[in-house]
Amino acid sequence: MNESSDSLPLEELEKAPMPSIFSSLRATVSKPLQSVLDIEHYIKCNQRTEMLTQQYRKLMNVDTKLAGNIKRQSIAICPSIQFLPKGRTLEYFDKETYWLMLDYDHVISLVLDEKVEKASHSKYAMAVYRTISGKGLRILLKYMRPAGCTLTATELHLSLIHI
C-alpha cells in the first residue's frame, strides 16, 4: 500500500490526485477522473446515467429488486482513493485524493433543494448532487489533513467515521 501521511496546504489540494471512477458499482477496473468537470459530466450530462436514473426511479415503486439491479449498473466514484487501474480493494490503493463524500439519504423533499443550493456554495464542495433515488444528497468535498497528522488515509477516514 502506498498511503501518504503528508499534509497538503490548500493550494496543493488543487494538484492532488483525482478520485477513481468505475463503469458500474460492480466493476473492478477504474480510471482517475481528469477534472471536476468530469464528475459534473458523468452526473448531470451523461446519457447512460440519465437513462439508468430514470429507469431506477420508475422501478422503485414497482420492483425494488429490479431497481437495485439497475442501480448496480450506474457509475461509481470513489472520492477518497485513486486506485491502481485494476482493483477495488485497499490492496489496490494508489494515492490519497484529499476528497471525501457526505451521503445523506431520505432527505425531506421540502428541504432537499435548499440543502443542495447551500452546499453548492461551499468553497470546499467539488460536486453536489441528488442521489439516484432523488431523495438523497451527496456532497463531494476537498479536505486538508490536520497539522501534524501522521495517520494513513485509511486510518484518518476510519477515525472520522467513529467521531
Model-based region annotation:
Residues 109-123:
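Short amphipathic alpha-helix segments
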Residues 1-98:
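DNA replication initiation on ssDNA origins
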Residues 155:
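Mg2+/Mn2+-dependent nuclease catalytic core
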Residues 161-163:
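Conserved small/polar residues in nucleotide/adenosyl-binding loops
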Residues 96-108:
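Acidic di-acidic motifs
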Residues 102, 120, 126-151:
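Histidine-centered divalent-metal-coordination microenvironment in nucleic-acid enzymes
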